[in-house]
Amino acid sequence: MAKKGTGESFTAPVSAIVDRARTGISNVDSDVVRGTISKIPNRIRRRFRESESSSLLTLFPIWAVLLSLAFTLSLLPHSGVLDCRDGFDNPSFCSDEPALNVNGDLEVYLPTDDDPHSVKNLIAQVEKDWTTNVMVIYVESYNYNVTQINILDQIDKVERVINNQTNDGGADDNVIYVLSISTVVKEVNSSGGRVVKAFFSGLAEATGNQQLSDEINETIDAQSDLIGNYAIPDEQQRVDQILQEMPQNALDKLVRDVGTATEDRAFRWNRAVIIIGIADDTGDKTVGDIVSETQGKIDEIAATNNWGAPDAQGKCDEDSNPLCLRMTLTGPAPLTNAVTEESFKLFWQVFPVGVIIVASMLFIFHCDLLQTGRIRFVQGVKVVIIAGLPTLCAVWVTLGLIGLLDYEVTMTVILVGPIVLSLGVSYGLHITNRYAESKGTPHEKMAAALNSTGRAVFLSAMTTIIGFISLTFAPMKPIQTVGWALAGGIVVVYFMTMIMVPNLTILLDLKKPSHPPHKVFVAAVNMPVKWSKITLALFLTVMIISAGYNRQNVEENIDLLKMAPNEVEAVQKMDVYSTEFEAGQPGFLLVEADIRADPELGIGSITADHPYANLEGIENLEAKCNDVENATAVSIVFLMKAIAVGVNVSGSPINDLIEDTPLPDPIKEVAELIFDRGQAGNVSFWTILDTLDAQEDDGGRQVQNFLLYVFYNSMTEEMRELFISPDYQRTLIYIDMPFMDVKSTAATAEQINLWAKSAGDSENPISVLGDTLIGVASITIEVNNLIVDSQWTSLAFALGFTIVTLALVFRDIRYALLTTVPVGFTVAMQWMVMDSGGVTLSLVTVMIGSILVGVGIDFSIHIANRVKELGGTLDAIRSSCASTGMSLFEATTVTAAGLTCAYGIPIEAITPFVTVIIILLIIAALSALLLLPAIYSFMVKSNLGLTGGATAMVKSSGLTQALIKRDIDATDSPLDYSNDAW
């Protein structure tokens, strides 16, 4: 009974509640409910329509900032900031694999076209049969001649470790060929046995007597130690004999006497090079991996063979009796790799310095130290966070997007960071300054700031983007990538600024007092307004001098070494190699001529193509190229001159055996040359071929062809295909040139091209592909020629589209033209600045003009926008320029200070670029502050008006005074100097 009572007491109140709910629901008018629900979407839409875009940006301040930071952090690993580098090499935190896809090859600057004789397509023709990926091991011997057996043995050890699978085309070890004094000595030393085998191989092919060939091969294999094998000889006398038979041009390519620390000559060869051809297809390995592995192998051999550690004077610790030998990896491939892998590592080392500099400058300008002499620490820190954090995020996001998209870039893209960092802070400052001027609640002040400043910031961003986009019209892809990256960076900065700055400002509740403009700026502006004609004449004179005189003195010069980080040992040694060996810019003459020789005997062996005649044409062209200043040429002919025909063979009397065998007379003649050293002596293949060529009968021609067949087959495949294509229809003449200025490079290349063209009209005519030198020098010259065209193209686009954009925004073409004049002046001044500093037009400095358009137009826009708002009178001009002067000074100082961090990047080409940019930034600010008011004042005083159309007609008719007075009355508040917060 108790339990039942409890249940009844509980259900009674519940029933009462349910009854009341039913009664209430029954009294609800369903039509009213439906009407209310149907109005909800309309109310939401009306609320959004009533809300300004500025208030929407600040609806959720904390979430907006947090989402922006989260987005930045998600892209951070792709920006390269976590790449391993000096001081940050813990594999737990950093990545050995570069985040950005950087290509340091100069060839990427070449445009792609359909012209078969364009530089890029000619290089592709060479790459069908040969590799253009080359490494050079620079050998320095301080105690011994590099051709002494003990040093040759060390070079041989390095070669055998690096090229452990010879004649494999790089399939197993990624090395196609090795060329050095060691390989030539080994090639010549082992040629005897291969000559004999090649002779009997040709004999078997010509006569069908394969049994005799097999018997002789067994004899040769048994006497390999006596005849010579592919190794460094045991006797120095044999090495010296081989060297004496080598042509001088071949020796100059492989060994040099560069003197000592105190003497010009050492009277011995104390430098050598090992030239290594790398396969184009290296599988999973990158060129960087191969470079690292090769240097590691060299270091290991050095440690185990007591090379010692030569100091700067070439001295070694004699206690351990070292060889005092050093080998350093350099050459085009390591140089390209240094640009590829080291550039961004170096950038991230100096970028924090730039961040600190920009933050410090922001703090100094906004802590009231300059305005009142007192420091408002909290205020300064708030401005640093508000203006600096979005820009820092924008830099990381920009580089992160480049890395995420795997967009191929070049070394020049490292300029994106400092430029975006320096420019980006100004957008945030414009908003915070106007926020500080406004009254009301934080949201009301921000709405007012965005409504008044948002248009100017958007216009600044648009014109800056246009300036940077103009770089994409250059014919060189790397400059296009810089343009896209900078333009994309400004887009990111704009969105980050519009999202983060308003919300950070509200969250931090920034409060800044307003200050009147400094008297210096008021006085400076009064001069061009008062003496507008004199100011215009002065600026015009300086511009004419720069564009007319200084422009002619600025030379175009491409120097790949200056675009590489000079702290890398491979780069330093490349400069030494270039100087001491007069090499470093490898090039090729691709000769299209049939030099094939068959062992066939009889009249059928004499074909229309005369292989020796073509070889003579190659030898003549090689000799003429060697006579050209700053050029060293070698071809297959140098090996023909270095390898002797005669062979020492003991045991079976091979020559007697041949005499007893019925063979055609040409075969017996060749046999006498090879096996009768008493008759042939120590004569080279080339000498014998030349002697046979003097014979007018067909027998001499048959012997010549048979001997050529023997020579080709006596070479190792690796050495033969270094010079000759597998089908014997194409051969290379290797041309080496030192790194020089473009004028000297062009002069040398032009002379070589003349000889290449004349080779088709010589006594022994041969065809050179394109009649031109192919390789690094030709790329340098072609890119240099493209620089000037790309500069004018990008400048024309930048200025043209900037004017169009301003005309659309201001709705007046005349006002747009007048506003752009200071930018044109700044661009014209680049030649005076570059000429004064001895700066050449390079792959980096060529971008200065377009970057200045993007940066400099900002200065003019802020003044022009304020002048237009205030009515375009003389007072409006004075007020606008004076109140904007301090902002220009701040923007210029912060931008220049931020760019100075790039001085810390050890790449020589960047230093003059940064210097010129900083100087021209100052000129851009001065031209906006002085030239622009002079132009406006002149137009107003001349009654020409600042704008066209109906406004100009009113002014020209003398009806302006009432309008001007009305405009001044309507804009009294903006004209008050105290309203500019800076």
What are these regions (language model features)?
Residues 1-21, 394-508, 904-905, 920:
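Hydrophobic alpha-helical segments
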Residues 2-359, 367-377, 511-792, 941-982:
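Feature of extramembrane
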Residues 63, 349, 353, 385, ...:
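Alpha-helical transmembrane segments of multi-pass inner-membrane proteins
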Residues 344-389, 393-397, 462-470, 788-825, ...:
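Internal alpha-helical transmembrane segments of multipass membrane proteins
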Residues 346-349, 388, 427, 439-474, ...:
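Pore- and gate-forming transmembrane helices of large, multi-pass membrane proteins
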Residues 361, 402-405, 458-506, 512, ...:
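Hydrophobic, glycine/alanine-rich multi-pass transmembrane helices and their short helix-loop junctions
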Residues 372-431, 814-863, 946:
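Hydrophobic transmembrane alpha-helices and their membrane-interface caps
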Residues 719-723, 730-851, 861-864, 884, ...:
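Membrane-proximal extracellular juxtamembrane segment immediately upstream
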